[in-house]
Amino acid sequence: MSRFTFKQFHINQDSCAMKVSTDGILLGAWADVKHCKNILDMGSGTGLLALMLAQRTEENCQIQAVELDPIAVKQAQENINDSVWKNRIQLIQTDIQHFLQTTAQTFDLIVANPPYFEQGIACKNEERELARYTKQSHLNWLEWAATRLSENGRISFVLPYEAGKTLIKSTALFCIKQTNVITKIGKTPQRMLLTFAKQPQVLMQDQLVIYDADNQYTEAFIKLTKDFYLKF
């Protein structure tokens, strides 16, 4: 699908390596945006997360989206320019680590749908490989993000379930929210939505089931994503 149309914006993705995914949509709808004035989207791809978060936040919230791949940057800029939030989203083409080491800005929310496929799986093109693979671990991404987090800020990731469990054990940050994502009722969790903070808080844990036993979307999934999907 070369274009993915949402209720308030669209994503052109014909030349971008990584397409719109349920993972990204879940994170964009799930991340806590309360009291956010500055948001960072790490590894923006098509610009999906930046646009979803722009839709969910107030006009005074500014969003910076960082992406290394020049082809993805070109397409993301087109998507942003076609939206009503183009004046609130700044797209930056650079390496994430370099950006975080050089910016003076701190962020109230940092989001990422990071690469998680292991090295060694063949990809058809270099751009897709760049988007899917990383020599850096999820812990690296989290630690880099933490350096530019405001005192009461939050970092939210979507990860494979086992990778999420590993990250929670590995970081010195506090996991304050965890949602285990189950594709269909009765199955084991496949994904994990996580929020980390510098300060300890009571951990909020729950689960989200996407499909019920009749292969229909659950009420919880519809409630979470209804502001975006045309079908709801």
UniProtKB/Swiss-Prot annotation:
Give any GO molecular function from the UniProt entry.
Answer: tRNA (adenine-N6)-methyltransferase activity
Question: What EC designation does it have?
Answer: 2.1.1.223
Name one process (GO BP) from the record: methylation
Keyword annotations? Cytoplasm, Methyltransferase, S-adenosyl-L-methionine, Transferase, tRNA processing
Chief location category: cytoplasm
**GO CC, any one term:** cytoplasm
Pfam families in the record: MTS (PF05175)
UniProt catalytic activity: adenosine(37) in tRNA1(Val) + S-adenosyl-L-methionine = N(6)-methyladenosine(37) in tRNA1(Val) + S-adenosyl-L-homocysteine + H(+)
Query: Could you tell me which InterPro entries the record lists for this protein?
Result: DNA_methylase_N6_adenine_CS, SAM-dependent_MTases_sf, Small_mtfrase_dom, tRNA_Adenine-N(6)_MTase, tRNA_adenine-N6_MeTrfase
- Primary enzyme class: transferase
**Where is it localised?**
Cytoplasm
Question: What CDD domains would the database entry show?
Answer: AdoMet_MTases
Q: List the SUPFAM superfamilies hit by this protein, alphabetically.
A: S-adenosyl-L-methionine-dependent methyltransferases
Q: Which PANTHER family match?
A: TRNA1(VAL) (ADENINE(37)-N6)-METHYLTRANSFERASE
Protein purpose:
Specifically methylates the adenine in position 37 of tRNA(1)(Val) (anticodon cmo5UAC).
The protein in question is named tRNA1(Val) (adenine(37)-N6)-methyltransferase
Q: Which organism is it from?
A: Haemophilus influenzae (strain PittGG)
